[in-house]
Amino acid sequence: MEKDSLSRADQQYECVAEIGEGAYGKVFKARDLKNGGRFVALKRVRVQTSEEGMPLSTIREVAVLRHLETFEHPNVVRLFDVCTVSRTDRETKLTLVFEHVDQDLTTYLDKVPEPGVPTETIKDMMFQLLRGLDFLHSHRVVHRDLKPQNILVTSSGQIKLADFGLARIYSFQMALTSVVVTLWYRAPEVLLQSSYATPVDLWSVGCIFAEMFRRKPLFRGSSDVDQLGKILDIIGLPGEEDWPRDVALPRQAFHSKSAQPIEKFVTDIDELGKDLLLKCLTFNPAKRISAYGALNHPYFQDLERYKDNLNSHLPSNQSTSELNTA
């Protein structure tokens, strides 16, 4: 990370427009004046500092992002640069410079004409999404906040994951803002405030998979408990053995109910797609499919052109299903 009191970020990058503002800070579309005026996305985040400087957790997260960037994975957004500027003794402005992609999956789904996204396009996008996610998991990165707004879609239909590996960097900025973070893609173990690991991302993938068919979210809760209730209305109340032990909210707080047919809520999905969706939307994270397992699901068996180069982005013998968060 380069620190410059004259703000190198302001010298090298010319802001064109503000393109987003969320719990994590503002995002700007900008020109990179040192690289032919290419468009980039600037994400500006405020980080709490102390006498010792920037928190070690922040430095580690940036180091992980830098390491992932060396692989240039096709389904992960590129990180071009990181700049820091001290604002005060207790705060630093961190500027992350990413490649710019014009639309996210939310915009894409809003714009798609009737009758919706072709089933083959959904399959293609899902495979790319899972390939990017498996790459992150194989490098011990849990996304934690996967949703259509941070899945980018290029003009050629390439999927790129964004906003990963930044949970600790974002924590201070989020405490300063009142923006509500959506619950609609959160796994049951997160809603119950239980321990969690990579399976949380596969739950989010299941929600996104369903939304590609529906063009609207599958579970739209207004609070953690309401969200959990909406989930159980569809997938049914799990057995006692699948309810986490370390949570304040007991299984008995919810009415006993059976699972409803998923095709009632996700029409046009075929049998293999339904099987994959239910494996993602499995209540118990230990029984949920992994990203690597999902990539090898029969649903994708006719996408051999992707499987040919899948292994070039995976470490050998890497199990990705049980990585714990620190």
Swiss-Prot record:
One of its GO terms (biological process) is negative regulation of transcription by RNA polymerase II. Keywords: Acetylation, ATP-binding, Cell cycle, Cell division, Cell projection, Cytoplasm, Cytoskeleton, Differentiation, Kinase, Nucleotide-binding, Nucleus, Phosphoprotein, Serine/threonine-protein kinase, Transferase. GO terms for molecular function: ATP binding; cyclin binding; cyclin-dependent protein serine/threonine kinase activity; FBXO family protein binding; kinase activity; protein serine kinase activity. Disruption phenotype: Slight anemia and defective proliferation of some hematopoietic cells, thymocytes and progenitor cells. Females are reduced in size and often sterile. Prevents the expansion of neuronally committed precursors by prematurely exiting the cell cycle and lengthening G1 phase duration, reducing concomitantly the production of newborn neurons. Interaction with D-type G1 cyclins. Cyclin binding promotes enzyme activation by phosphorylation at Thr-177. Binds to RUNX1, CDKN2D, FBXO7 and CDKN2C/p18-INK4c. Forms a cytoplasmic complex with Hsp90/HSP90AB1 and CDC37. FBXO7-binding promotes D-type cyclin binding. The modification Phosphothreonine is found at T49, T70, T177, T325. GO terms for cellular component: centrosome; cyclin D1-CDK6 complex; cyclin D2-CDK6 complex; cyclin D3-CDK6 complex; cytosol; nucleoplasm; ruffle. CDD domains: STKc_CDK6 (cd07862). The modification N-acetylmethionine is found at M1. It comes from Mus musculus. It is an enzyme of class 2 (transferase). Pfam families: Pkinase. Changing R31C: Enhanced kinase activity. Over-production of thymocytes and hematopoietic stem cells and progenitor cells. Changing S321A: In strain: SPRET/Ei. SUPFAM superfamilies: Protein kinase-like (PK-like) (SSF56112). The modification Phosphoserine is found at S319. It is found in: Cytoplasm; Nucleus; Cell projection, Ruffle; Cytoplasm, Cytoskeleton, Microtubule organizing center, Centrosome. Gene3D superfamilies: Phosphorylase Kinase, domain 1, Transferase(Phosphotransferase) domain 1. This is Cyclin-dependent kinase 6. InterPro entries: CDK, CDK6, Kinase-like_dom_sf, Prot_kinase_dom, Protein_kinase_ATP_BS, Ser/Thr_kinase_AS. ATP binds at I19, G20, E21, G22, A23, Y24, G25, K26, V27, K43. It catalyses: L-seryl-[protein] + ATP = O-phospho-L-seryl-[protein] + ADP + H(+); L-threonyl-[protein] + ATP = O-phospho-L-threonyl-[protein] + ADP + H(+). Thr-177 phosphorylation and Tyr-24 dephosphorylation promotes kinase activity. Its EC number is 2.7.11.22. The keyword Cell wall biogenesis/degradation does not apply. Belongs to the protein kinase superfamily. CMGC Ser/Thr protein kinase family. CDC2/CDKX subfamily. The active site is at D145 (proton acceptor).
